[in-house]
Every structure is written in structure tokens, then in C-alpha cells.
Amino acid sequence: GAGIFTAVLFAVGFLCSLPVLPWCPLLAAVNILLLIMYSTSFKRMPLLGNLCVAYLTGSVFLFGGMAAGPESFLLTAPLFLVTFLGILSREIVKDAEDIEEDSKSGAYTLPMLIGVRASAVTAFVCMTAAAAAAFIPAVHWGIFYAAGILAVDIYLLRISAKVLPCRTPEEVSASRTASYMKYGMVAAILVFFLSAAAVRLW
């Protein structure tokens, strides 16, 4: 059934990582273990599930950097940090929206533990940290990257701030913060891609 199919996918993914540099299979093994732990227990725990999702999403950049070598890893590590913090922020907002549904499913999320208001502040702090970290690659990618990511940062911070006055899951959902965050994250990835391509071409 689904378990066998998942196991096959895990095995294929790990085998595909073997021909790459030695650190890549290790990262693949860690990620597989985290995915298993997330699906069995972490996703029902406050913050731990959010951290797991944020790490796994950002680890795409870690894997790419490791595969390309030490110099590329130094460049992609800040992208991992930005992605980790941004996804963590959005995950917390989503949990604040879904308190009732999560409670029915037996999950115990961060907003249930500390409340909607404190969760909104935590999400905003994470996004602010992500926005600050997003300027680190400007050392390699220059002024045009800095200008592009500044525009994205302003958008994401304004969107993240919309959740700060919220006191209930209904207010968080009505703000549509989690949905609008996705657009900013897609824009950030586009800025990453275009900046990296421009540096290679020029």
C-alpha cells in the first residue's frame, strides 16, 4: 500500500544521492529519518513539527550546495537560513488558523500552547529575521539582488504584520496572511534564481 510506495521512494531518493559528494547521502538519510519522525509524531507536537517542515524545505539549498562543492555550499547556506525562517513563520501562522481542526485531530500545536497573539508575534519575529538574513547573499550577487530582495522583504514584512492584531483563529484566517506569504516566497525564489543566473552570465 502507501507505506510500501513511500519506502520505495525513500530508497530511490537515497540511492540517487550516493554518486554525489559524501555529505549528500548523509543529508538524504537525515531527511528521510526526519520525514518518518514527522509523520509519526513530530507533526502533533508544538513547534517541533514546524521546525521539521522548515528545515526539510530549506535543506533543498543545503543539498544543492553540498552537491556543487564547498564554495557553493557557503553561498547556499544563507538561502537555507532564509527559507528555514520564512517557512517557520508561515507554519506558525497556519497553525494559528487551524487550532480547531488540529485539536480535533489530536495535535498539540504552538498556538494551543502559547496562544494566538504570542504565536503571531513569534511568526513576525521569524519573518523579520528571514528578511535580514536575505541580504547576506548580496555580498556575492550585488546591488541588483539587494534591490530585488528589498522589495520582497518589504512585502513579506507588511503581510506578516497583518497577523499581529489577531486574537482568534478566525481573525488569522480572515487576514489571509499564510496565503499571501506564499506569493512573497515565490518572488524571493525568483530573485534568488535570476541573481544567480545573472552572476554566471556576466
Where are these regions (language model features)?
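Extended hydrophobic alpha-helices typical of membrane-associated regions
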Residues: 139-202
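Transmembrane alpha-helical segments that form the membrane-embedded catalytic/substrate-channel core
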Residues: 32-40, 58-59, 81-96, 152-163
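Alpha-helical transmembrane segments
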Residues: 74-86, 141-148
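Intramembrane alpha-helical segments
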Residues: 1-72, 78
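Transmembrane helix-loop junctions in multipass membrane proteins, especially transporters and channels
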Residues: 18-22, 40-44, 69-70, 95, ...
